[in-house]
């Protein structure tokens, strides 16, 4: 029995997330299941603006942006699980706990972002997230996002 994967292209991602270049950090969703998990891709290019200063001689993708990519993935999963945003609504990145950075991410890498839904209460959703490159975990954390009007 084959299970068809649910995906999202960049247009579908932009319908749910307010982020745009250079801060939209999810390129494609390769699989998700509402209220369960979401797997997404972030292609890391040397042409991204952060590499002019982090670091010019040895470019390393900033860890805080890996966490932001995971946070964006949680927002996508939350909207897919609990309904699309209204015109004045979005998911804010509320907290991160236990972040661990295990290996540098460099231009040319393709990060696979995996977030797993844990629970939701009063508009705050909790997730476990990992980022992988070539099957190896480069970052892990627990994240929360809060659905709010702006």
Curated annotation (Swiss-Prot):
This is 3-hydroxyacyl-[acyl-carrier-protein] dehydratase FabZ. Gene3D superfamilies: Hotdog Thioesterase. Its EC number is 4.2.1.59. One of its GO terms (biological process) is lipid A biosynthetic process. It is found in: Cytoplasm. It comes from the Bacteria. It is an enzyme of class 4 (lyase). Its main location: cytoplasm.
């Amino acid at each position: 029995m084959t299970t068809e994967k649910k995906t999202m292209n960049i247009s579908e991602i932009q319908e749910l997330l307010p982020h745009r270049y250079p801060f939209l950090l999810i390129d494609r969703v390769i699989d998700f299941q509402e209220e369960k998990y979401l797997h997404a891709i972030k292609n890391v290019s040397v042409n991204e603006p952060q590499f002019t200063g982090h670091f010019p001689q040895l470019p390393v993708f900033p860890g805080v942006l890996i966490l932001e990519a995971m946070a964006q993935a949680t927002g996508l999963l939350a909207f897919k699980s609990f309904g699309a945003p209204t015109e004045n609504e979005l998911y804010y990145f509320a907290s991160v706990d236990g972040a661990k950075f295990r290996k540098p991410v460099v231009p040319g890498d393709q990060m696979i972002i995996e977030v797993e839904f844990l629970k939701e209460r009063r508009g705050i959703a909790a997730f476990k997230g990992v980022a992988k490159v070539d099957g190896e975990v480069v970052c892990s954390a627990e994240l929360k996002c809060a659905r709010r009007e702006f």
